[in-house]
């Protein structure tokens, strides 16, 4: 099969299986309301949990830095792309989360891939939750290590996988808050087990940082757990983009010396780092926004009892409505759009087969009226 035939075959199969994705150009987005093709929708698909995307101080910080330092970083961090602004942000992140070092990355996907592909050598063992993000699964299976997936949020399964495995250094990986189900990992038990077996524990807290824990320090702080490696991202609660890895001095130096993702990638723009530094300040003083988000979560849970048979057990901003069938999920998503509500349909391979869903994400800017309209619309359109 030549290139064109293979590509066309795969695309046609994607369409046939109702997995085809359509990229939509958003005209205006203030986080609560988005405009697409001249239509206005209440947005329940944004990861900007605290509504900082349009924060005036953060926007001004980006403008100021772009004027002062220019737009591009001009090189990798190991050439000339690393500035005193990057250094300052890394130091502030490390101090905030009580780690010796922080390393900036251009995305969470890159950060996770860099850690796993750089650390893992032949016969090392990787133990990861079955519902781990693609940025964890893909580099793990592409590494020279041995991969084991334990039952979702099941420490007993993790332990069984470990004791029935053979190999060298164990790396345990989990998310703090899972991106598609919104549930929280049993971090305390997993952390204790990792220490017992002298392994490394890596936690991806993309959806917890800024939202959970004291001062927004994330789900690990909330559960009094300090993993050996912590990945945080700036595209969710921080309202920007990018990521950072928090770790020991030794691991940080190892990544700097051996990670191709750091060596051969252009560094984050200085203006972006400057804006993230301002966003960090806002996060540290965002208790009011976190309380408002929690109020919205509580309001949704209290008023969505009519949908309880469709909901997963989540107490976070991520509230999945499980439909199962790909086509039914897409139809419901389109029907909600006709009611002025934007909720994306999430289908395999992002989620397991037969678990297609509407992934509702609540934020601090939603009103009670927004949430009531969402619940009422889903109930009327999909009363099963």
UniProtKB/Swiss-Prot annotation:
Matches recorded under InterPro entries: Aminotrans_II_pyridoxalP_BS (IPR001917), Aminotransferase_I/II_large (IPR004839), AON_synthase_class-II (IPR050087), AONS_Proteobacteria (IPR022834), PyrdxlP-dep_Trfase (IPR015424), PyrdxlP-dep_Trfase_major (IPR015421), PyrdxlP-dep_Trfase_small (IPR015422)
Molecular function per GO: 8-amino-7-oxononanoate synthase activity; pyridoxal phosphate binding
Where N6-(pyridoxal phosphate)lysine occurs, the residues are 236
For this protein, what is the EC number? Answer: 2.3.1.47
Binding of pyridoxal 5'-phosphate, residues: 108-109, 179, 207, 233
Cofactor requirement: pyridoxal 5'-phosphate
Which principal EC class is assigned to this enzyme?
transferase
Q: Name the residues that bind substrate.
A: 21, 133, 350
Q: Indicate yes or no for the key word Transferase.
A: yes
Tell me the Pfam families matching this sequence: Aminotran_1_2
Which SUPFAM superfamilies does this entry report, sorted A to Z? PLP-dependent transferases
Q: Which UniProt keywords apply?
A: Biotin biosynthesis, Pyridoxal phosphate, Transferase
Q: In which pathway does it act?
A: Cofactor biosynthesis; biotin biosynthesis
Any one GO biological process: biotin biosynthetic process
Q: What's its catalytic activity?
A: 6-carboxyhexanoyl-[ACP] + L-alanine + H(+) = (8S)-8-amino-7-oxononanoate + holo-[ACP] + CO2
UniProt subunit comment: Homodimer.
HAMAP family per the UniProt record, alphabetical? BioF_aminotrans_2
What does it do? Catalyzes the decarboxylative condensation of pimeloyl-[acyl-carrier protein] and L-alanine to produce 8-amino-7-oxononanoate (AON), [acyl-carrier protein], and carbon dioxide.
Q: Which family does it belong to?
A: Belongs to the class-II pyridoxal-phosphate-dependent aminotransferase family. BioF subfamily.
**Can you say what this protein is called?**
8-amino-7-oxononanoate synthase
Q: What is the lineage of its organism?
A: Bacteria, Pseudomonadati, Pseudomonadota, Gammaproteobacteria, Enterobacterales
């Amino acid at each position: 099969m030549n290139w064109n035939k293979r590509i066309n075959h795969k695309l046609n199969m994607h369409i046939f299986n109702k997995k085809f994705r359509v990229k939509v150009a958003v005209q205006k987005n203030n986080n609560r309301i988005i405009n697409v093709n001249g239509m206005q929708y209440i947005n329940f698909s944004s990861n900007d949990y605290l509504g900082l995307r349009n924060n005036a101080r953060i926007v001004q910080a980006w403008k100021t830095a772009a004027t002062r330092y220019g737009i591009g970083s001009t090189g990798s961090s190991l050439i000339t792309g690393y500035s005193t602004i990057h250094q300052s942000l890394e130091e502030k992140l490390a101090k905030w989360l009580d780690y010796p070092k922080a390393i900036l990355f251009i995305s969470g996907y890159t950060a996770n891939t860099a850690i796993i592909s750089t650390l893992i050598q032949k016969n090392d063992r990787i133990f990861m939750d079955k519902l781990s993000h693609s940025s964890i699964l893909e580099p793990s299976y592409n590494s020279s290590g041995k991969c084991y997936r334990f039952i979702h949020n099941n420490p007993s399964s993790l332990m069984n996988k470990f004791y029935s495995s053979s190999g060298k250094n164990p790396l345990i990986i989990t998310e703090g808050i899972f991106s598609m189900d919104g549930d929280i990992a049993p971090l305390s038990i997993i952390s204790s087990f990792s220490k017992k077996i002298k392994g490394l524990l890596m936690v991806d807290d993309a959806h917890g940082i800024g939202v959970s824990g004291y001062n927004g320090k994330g789900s690990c702080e909330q559960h009094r757990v300090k993993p050996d490696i912590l990945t945080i991202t700036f595209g969710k609660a921080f309202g920007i983009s990018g990521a950072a890895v928090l770790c020991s001095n030794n691991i940080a130096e190892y990544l700097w010396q051996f990670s191709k993702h750091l060596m051969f990638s252009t560094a984050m723009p200085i203006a972006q780092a400057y804006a993230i530094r301002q966003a960090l300040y806002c996060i540290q003083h965002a208790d009011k926004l976190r309380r408002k988000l929690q109020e919205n979560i509580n309001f949704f849970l209290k008023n969505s009892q009519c949908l309880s048979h469709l909901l997963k057990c989540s107490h976070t901003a991520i509230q999945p409505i499980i439909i199962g069938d790909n086509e039914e999920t897409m139809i419901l998503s389109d029907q909600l759009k006709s009611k002025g509500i934007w909720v994306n349909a999430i289908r395999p391979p992002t989620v397991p087969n037969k678990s297609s869903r509407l992934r509702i994400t609540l934020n601090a800017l939603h009103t009670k009226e927004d949430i009531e309209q969402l619940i009422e619309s889903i109930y009327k359109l999909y009363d099963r």
